[in-house]
């Protein structure tokens, strides 16, 4: 049970890592009329979940967890570099690094020590932070992947509630419906071939690149 509680803490929206400050392009998509209601938001998020998280973040998270446990530092660093290379806009790269930097300051306070090898990895990507925490707290790969996906989803729905806008009840209903997709994404990630690891979300990439110069915005760029 304690391991599960640690996992809940790791994905909590109250965690001071700035997850709620970025929209990952959704703010621009909403302004331009791509996403105008809860149905379109569900479609937008489902595509990201199945074509990015399930095929990029979650497979890399599993690999990093194993490699860091085995102290295969060079291979682990290569996968951290790979994550950054797949952040296709300046905004997405900045978000990844800023969350990683926040985790680099937070993990030691949670009892997870970082050394001269692991510290640069965590500063580079939050995925490395989750992998280190998983090893420290003996979290199972399936639970870790599901929790990572849930944390991403909850933050994305918060963005939708603020910007579409949606009511709080509609947001909770969307979370309930989208939760059914998370097990599918986790299973897909566990069987995804290594040579195909990557993301294919061109609409999100375009929206993120345009959000960088959006005149009025609530979320960081």
Swiss-Prot record:
Chaperone is among the record's keywords: yes
Keywords, ordered alphabetically: Chaperone, Cytoplasm, Nickel insertion
Stored Pfam families: UreF
A single GO cellular-component term on record: cytoplasm
Keyword Chaperone: yes
GO molecular function, one term: nickel cation binding
Compartment list: Cytoplasm
Role description: Required for maturation of urease via the functional incorporation of the urease nickel metallocenter.
Family: Belongs to the UreF family.
Subunit and interaction comment: UreD, UreF and UreG form a complex that acts as a GTP-hydrolysis-dependent molecular chaperone, activating the urease apoprotein by helping to assemble the nickel containing metallocenter of UreC. The UreE protein probably delivers the nickel.
Name assigned to this protein: Urease accessory protein UreF
Species, as recorded: Aliivibrio fischeri (strain MJ11)
Gene: ureF
């Amino acid at each position: 049970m304690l391991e599960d509680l640690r996992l809940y803490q790791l994905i909590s929206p109250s965690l001071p890592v700035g997850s709620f400050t970025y929209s990952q392009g959704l703010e621009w998509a909403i302004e331009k009329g791509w996403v105008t209601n809860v149905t379109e938001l569900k479609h937008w998020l489902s595509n990201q979940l199945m074509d990015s998280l399930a095929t990029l973040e979650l497979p890399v998270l599993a690999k990093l967890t194993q490699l860091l446990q085995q102290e295969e530092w060079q291979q682990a660093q290569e996968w951290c570099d790979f994550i950054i290379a797949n952040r296709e806009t300046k905004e997405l790269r900045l978000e990844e690094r800023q969350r990683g930097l926040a985790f680099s300051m937070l993990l030691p306070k949670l009892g997870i020590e970082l050394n001269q090898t692991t510290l640069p990895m965590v500063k580079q990507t939050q995925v490395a932070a989750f992998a280190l925490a998983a090893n420290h707290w003996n979290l199972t790969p399936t639970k870790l992947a599901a929790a990572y996906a849930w944390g991403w989803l909850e933050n994305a729905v918060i963005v939708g509630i603020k910007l579409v806008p949606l009511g709080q009840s509609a947001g909770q209903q969307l979370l309930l419906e989208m939760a059914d997709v998370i097990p599918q994404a986790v299973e897909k990630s566990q069987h995804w071939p290594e040579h195909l690891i990557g993301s294919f979300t061109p609409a999100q990439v375009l929206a993120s690149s345009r959000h960088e110069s959006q005149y009025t915005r609530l979320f960081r760029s």
